[in-house]
Swiss-Prot record:
GO molecular function: DNA binding; DNA-directed DNA polymerase activity; single-stranded DNA 3'-5' DNA exonuclease activity
Protein name according to UniProt: DNA polymerase II large subunit
EC number: 2.7.7.7, 3.1.11.1
UniProt function note: Possesses two activities: a DNA synthesis (polymerase) and an exonucleolytic activity that degrades single-stranded DNA in the 3'- to 5'-direction. Has a template-primer preference which is characteristic of a replicative DNA polymerase.
Pfam family, one: PolC_DP2_central
Subunit architecture: Heterodimer of a large subunit and a small subunit.
InterPro entries (alphabetical): PolC_DP2 (IPR004475), PolC_DP2_cat_dom (IPR056172), PolC_DP2_central_dom (IPR056171), PolC_DP2_N (IPR016033)
Keywords: DNA replication, DNA-binding, DNA-directed DNA polymerase, Exonuclease, Hydrolase, Multifunctional enzyme, Nuclease, Nucleotidyltransferase, Transferase
HAMAP family xref list: DNApol_II_L_arch (MF_00324)
GO biological process, one term: DNA-templated DNA replication
PANTHER family xref list: DNA POLYMERASE II LARGE SUBUNIT
Length: 1088
């Protein structure tokens, strides 16, 4: 078979040729999978992932209304996304106007699908129901019942879905919703309760809630999503549940109230006067200023360290710019910083940050500053490379400066966060330098000379953190200088000045009672001194000005800019992730074994235990030749095609099915170490997967996902340019992929770089797919790979959780990191950014051959994370707009840096900063973009966070608090108190309560009991293996660590009292015993 993906290319591909190549290869793969499906050996006879070339096709496939794609395309040429959404809703309502309920339902779902680009599952599952109810006066009203998956749509889309409901209501002539006072009070109580148990991004005031509910022309309703019920306002006629309605709370609070300003723009332009009440809602201000915030410190987790308290000296210094692996919410750090920070920060790790958003994934950039550290020998040095960091790691006693964090302008634009003052850096300083002067190699003397001669600011390498010290410290430093002396091209200053010099960021070596400063001249000049004939002389008398910085400007007679006016607080969020997706427990086949497979769900055990026959609820087929009924689409007795007869609880002859599978595959089941199924099928029809697929997965050691595919999960990180050497491919392979052979290439938007771990897994999956094609379908193999490297050029499907639309990607290489490098457009097409999000890939042929929507769970959220539609090509106009805010300049202009000094709104500079959106508008392409900082190697940095390598929680906590003590910008006592109050105490209190209301579990068949059976035996399988589900160990697991921290750290008195009370209660409840409770087996009436 000739396959396109192996065709050698010699020419460099342009964007159009690249897109055609992707489309052709997808079609080739689709055709082969269709050929296999048509053999009738699957649960459907066609490939179940429809291909979509654009958003309009995705929406048509997702919602299932034929003919709307063309209308969406036409409207999109002349309207904004939101306007298209509202207009299409009107049109769809008119199509179904004879049935008002159906018209409302279809119109609202289509409108929401347009707002979410046809990628999210929210239009299908986020709206549980659309209904027509009755007001007290007998008139009709429209109610929209929201479910949990609406969260994924985002606040604006949530709010606009209510607006769409109102527009359609008017179109159909239905009157408005009129709530009663009691219903309004129910909303207030319910929202406050939801915030307590789940936490809302924005909790409106009772008056704001009342205003929205009273004035909204549409009833914002929801399913009872939480276990907790409201205590008052129960059993109401028009509210179907007493449970808290999560979907309603999200739409009202994070949608209508929080996004009130945005919604008003649309209501005003459409003259919807009934929505003018939103103008009196303050909501949550969209204008974020540059102010100190400790929000990122909330909910600290034990073992995940804090790297800097909010805006604290010594914390990360904000540096504006974009590396080739940052932007789209990802931030870059010097690899040395990753290592020095206890190796907790790895490439792909998530850090929670103070600004501009909530979090960022970390990527490497070795052309920005690393940390400055104090060593055991008294030296104070800056470390700018990871090799030096490894060499000095054990000698570090204090991390006095965390180094720089590189954050792109585009992230401030996306978050609408006013630009904090930039650090004074070399790229800013260079723009003051007169034309023709070389500013690359500037020593300490030349730096001062240039400032004096051209009246430009002092070079940032010799500009210190004057804003971090007090007048008293400045004056102490001056007195120390008076007692210093020049010696061998260095300046010796008394050791007593070390604390001030550390705060200033001055590097030195210790020599006895003196500190040796090699770069001394700019410091002396800054303090009002100069050197004449190897002697230091004061040239300007000391005089205090309004600030220390202004004082050194006066004393030096040159301009000295604030070196690091903005520090960024941060802590570790989620560690990086790269691992194959396994259901819990691991499953090879979506085939039911009920309880006969015991806790391991073993299909082979179920066969032995039942002599091959047992009852299960499953979808059955009847053979068209011999009439035999089984869960297989082909007859396991005679091999003929079977026709579906429906779901029933009936006998499965597993032994017959397995024998037929052995014959068909040419495999003996004795060869399998393990072969696992599922206890029950969760789909609506209870359709079982052909068991042969599971056998082949078991042979290749891979697991199946709920939809029949094999996935690999990874943290998302961006890349816009790559070096072929760093991704493990040759020049020849680079050329074959359609790239020009050069050092750095701009990556195509659908090309992806996967971790080595993913390559190994996908290689195994490719072997499974080839076996499946040859042994099961009787077709030629598709992949025929000899090594993992042969994956290069093959296609994958990228799919994010909470979405229902996959995106085609092409593997072009491999990385050593545990994260997923891809173009910002690729991540955005999946509705993801790079703030710590993760998603998955699967081989394209795996998706086409093995995915079936009939396997998906029927529960709410069952359609999430399933490729219900596939985007073959990426269109920048149809992806999440965050990717269009990525900036593309080679250097930020002077006007930008000066704008940061007045904390300008980022939107003022959008045209200047050439975002992707502006580039497309001005040049009609997003290609030929650039970046401001290079990264020598995208694999250079910590590859695995020490959070994952430290063996025990005690080790993690010890390292977390040890690091807190070493970092100057961290308050270790505060970290200790927060760990106890946000993690340890809630955990112990919660497990203590649950211990006394727990279930009991049979370890053989997993049956659970609210009360222990009087016999002490499992009533289902007869086993005496009953055990607790929550053990004493779960209650006391953090107690010793908590008491230890209480002694070692200065924590608040009230917290100490809480700890002592809980410790006393636990010790009284669980006195020391000879045997731990986990070893005790419950038998007979021992429990009582």
């Amino acid at each position: 078979m000739t396959i396109l993906h192996s065709t050698m290319l010699s020419e460099v591909l342009d964007l159009e040729s690249y897109r055609k190549k992707i489309s052709d290869e997808v079609r080739e793969c689709f055709d082969l999978a269709s050929q296999a499906r048509e053999l009738g050996m699957d649960v459907t006879d066609k490939v179940e992932i429809p291909l979509a070339s654009d958003m309009a096709e995705r929406i048509e496939a997702l919602i299932g209304i034929s003919g709307i794609a063309d209308q969406i395309r036409d409207l999109s040429k002349k309207m904004s996304r939101e306007e298209v959404s509202l207009e299409m809703s009107r049109r769809v309502a008119n199509i179904f106007k004879d049935n008002k309920k159906e018209a409302l339902d279809k119109a609202i779902r289509v409108g929401l699908a347009i707002l979410t680009e046809g990628i999210l599952v929210a239009p299908l599952e986020g709206i549980a129901d659309v209904y027509i109810g009755k007001n007290a006066d007998g008139s009709d009203y429209v109610g929209i019942s929201y479910a949990g998956p609406i969260r994924g749509a985002g606040g604006t889309a949530q709010a606009l879905s209510v607006l769409i409901g109102d527009v359609v209501r008017r179109e159909l002539g239905i009157t408005r919703y009129i709530p009663t006072e009691e219903e309004i009070e129910r909303y207030i109580e319910e929202i406050e309760s939801y915030d307590r148990i789940k936490h809302l991004q924005y909790l409106p005031t009772p008056d704001e809630i009342k205003l929205v509910v009273k004035n909204s022309p549409v009833c914002i309703d929801g399913e009872g999503s939480e276990e907790e019920e409201v205590s008052g306002h129960r059993d109401m006629a028009r509210v179907k549940t007493n449970r808290i309605r999560g979907g309603m709370c999200l739409v009202l609070c994070e949608g209508l109230v929080q996004k009130a300003r945005k919604i008003l723009k649309y209501t005003s332009s459409m003259h919807l006067e009934e929505w003018s009440f939103l103008s009196s809602i303050s909501g949550k201000s969209d204008d974020k200023g540059s102010k100190k915030s400790d929000k990122f410190l909330k909910d600290i987790v034990a073992g995940r360290p804090v790297f800097s308290h909010p805006s604290r000296p010594g914390g990360f210094r904000l540096r504006y710019g974009r590396s080739r692996v940052s932007g789209l919410a990802a931030a870059s750090l010097n690899p040395a910083t990753m290592y020095i920070m206890g190796k907790f920060i790895a490439i792909g790790s998530q850090i929670k940050v103070e600004l501009p958003g909530k979090a960022a994934a970390v990527t490497p950039c070795d052309t920005i500053d690393g940390p400055t550290v104090l060593l055991r020998n008294g030296d104070h040095v800056k470390i700018n490379n990871i090799e030096k960091a490894k060499e000095l790691y054990d000698e570090v006693v204090e991390i006095t400066d965390a180094g720089e964090i590189l954050i792109a302008y585009g992230d401030f634009l996306e978050n609408n966060y006013n630009l904090p003052t930039a650090s004074f850096t070399k790229e800013w300083w260079m723009q003051y330098l007169p034309d023709g002067l070389d500013g690359n190699e500037v020593d300490q003397f030349r730096a001062v000379e240039l400032s004096r001669q051209y009246n430009i600011p002092l070079h940032p390498d010799f500009d210190y953190y004057w804003h971090d010290i007090s007048f008293e410290e400045l004056e102490y430093l001056i007195s120390a200088v008076e007692n210093g002396r020049l010696s061998d091209n260095s300046f010796l200053i008394p050791y007593s000045a070390s604390e001030v010099l550390i705060k200033l960021g001055v590097q030195f070596k210790r020599s006895g009672n003196f500190l040796v400063l090699n770069q001394y001249y700019p410091l002396l000049v800054s303090l009002g001194y100069d050197v004449f004939e190897d002697k230091i002389k004061r040239v300007k008398p000391y005089q205090r000005k309004s600030s220390v910085l202004e004082t050194v400007n006066y004393l030096s007679g040159i301009t000295i800019k604030p070196r690091a006016p903005t520090r960024v607080g941060s802590r570790l969020g989620r560690p990086e992730k790269a691992g194959d997706r396994k259901m819990k427990p691991m499953v090879h086949s979506l085939f039911p074994v009920e309880s006969y497979g015991e806790a391991r769900r073993s299909i082979l055990n179920a066969n032995k235990k039942t002599d091959g026959t047992y009852k299960a609820e499953v979808f059955f087929y009847r053979c068209t030749s011999c009439g035999y009924e089984s869960p297989s689409p082909t007859c396991p007795k005679c091999g003929s095609r079977s026709k579906p007869i429906g779901t029933k609880n009936s006998e499965i002859d597993l032994s017959v099915i397995l024998r037929k599978a052995e014959d068909r595959l040419g495999i003996k089941l004795d060869e399998l170490k393990e072969f696992k199924g599922v206890k029950k099928l969760m789909s609506k029809e209870k359709v079982a997967e052909p068991i042969e697929k599971g056998i082949l997965r078991a042979i290749h050691g891979i697991s199946v996902n709920k939809d029949g595919t094999c996935r690999f999960d990874m943290s998302d990180i961006p890349i816009t340019h790559f070096r072929y050497k760093e991704i493990g491919i040759s020049k020849e392979k680079l050329s074959e992929l359609g790239y020009e052979v050069k050092d750095v290439n701009e990556i195509f938007p659908q090309d992806v770089i996967i971790p080595r771990k993913a390559a190994k897994y996908l290689f195994d999956v490719s072997k499974f797919i080839d076996d499946l094609l040859v042994r099961y379908y009787g077709l030629p193999p598709f992949y025929s790979l000899k090594s993992e490297e042969d994956l290069v050029g093959h296609l994958v499907i990228g799919l994010a959780p909470h979405t229902s639309g996959g995106v085609v990607g092409r593997i072009i290489g491999f990385s050593d990191v545990n994260a997923f490098y891809a173009h910002p457009f690729f991540h955005a097409a999946k509705r993801r950014n790079c703030d710590g999000d993760e998603d998955s890939v699967m081989l394209l042929m795996d998706g086409f051959l093995n995915f079936s929507a009939r396997y998906l769970p029927s529960t709410t959220g069952g359609l999430m994370d399933a490729p219900l539609v596939l985007s073959v090509l990426i269109n920048p106009d149809e992806i999440d707009k965050e990717a269009l805010n990525v900036d593309t300049l080679q250097k930020y202009p002077l006007i930008f840096y000066e704008a940061t000094e007045r904390h300008a709104a980022p939107s003022e500079l959008e045209e200047t900063m050439m975002t992707m959106k502006v580039r497309i508008k001005k040049t009609a392409t997003y290609r030929n973009s650039s970046y401001t900082f290079d990264t020598s190697d995208i694999n250079k940095g910590v590859l695995v966070s020490s959070y994952k390598t430290l063996a025990t929680m005690d080790d993690k906590i010890s390292e977390q608090l040890g690091l807190a003590r070493r970092i100057r910008a961290v308050d270790a006592d505060d970290v200790a108190a927060r760990v106890i109050s946000t993690h340890f105490l809630p955990d112990m209190y919660g497990n203590f309560r649950r211990f006394f209301s727990q279930e009991f579990r049979c370890t053989k068949c997993n049956a659970k009991y609210r009360r222990i059976p009087l016999s002490g035996r499992c009533m289902k399988c007869g086993s005496d293996s009953l055990t607790l589900t929550i053990h004493k160990g779960s209650v006391i697991k953090y107690l010793d660590e908590t008491l230890k921290i209480e002694k070692e750290y200065n924590i608040p008195k009230y917290l100490k009292e809480r700890i002592d009370n809980l410790a006393r209660t636990i010790k009284e409840t669980f006195p020391d015993e000879e045997k731990p409770d986990a070893a005790i087996k419950i038998t007979g009436l021992d429990m009582y």
